[in-house]
């Protein structure tokens, strides 16, 4: 079986797993996102883009959230996926994700050690970083990794620079295996596709995404299947901090 077949099978399993929120059917958002043009100027640094809170605005937001969610699920590097998202939606120039290292420590749980296949005495490092594109904090990541399974240079970069984890270890040609993927914000209420009475939204108020919109948990492995990192990523509402797509 090819790597592409493996990824297709993995996505199928994830798609069937019950999540805290249902995922918009791929056929719907794939069509929708083709017709969501990007604002000509993009989002100004530090601005808060005002989206209308009506049905169309909420449907656009949902389609874009699901578009990002599937991009994250179908690629091994969340860092490079966010690079592309930042560039496509003109959130900053240059469109490059950087990490802001927070000097705190969170010991790995027994479950994390089990996922990483390490014993109770083996060293596991912790890296806590917001991931920023320009002035926009797009996600925050808790990362536990086994330094003995990285190169000396990779460990140096992780310990001394603002390089995002996925970029620092890119040379390992790692694979990402999703443990869970949850949509934390659902802009439309349950039953929206059936013309629910709940679809009467106020048009005079802006649509403001909450602080957290998507959460992923994943394990990264070497090409031979050896795990070396477990990551918990929480994506912020700032992923939509660009002008609402223009309407006809």
Give the positions of each predicted feature.
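N-terminal domain-onset segments
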Residues: 42-126, 130-132, 136-199, 204-214, ...
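Intrinsic structural disorder/low-complexity segments
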Residues: 7, 37, 219, 225-227
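N-terminal secretory signal peptides that target proteins for export/translocation
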Residues: 1-20
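Hydrophobic alpha-helical segments, especially transmembrane helices
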Residues: 17, 22-23, 35, 128
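Bacterial N-terminal signal peptides
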Residues: 25-37
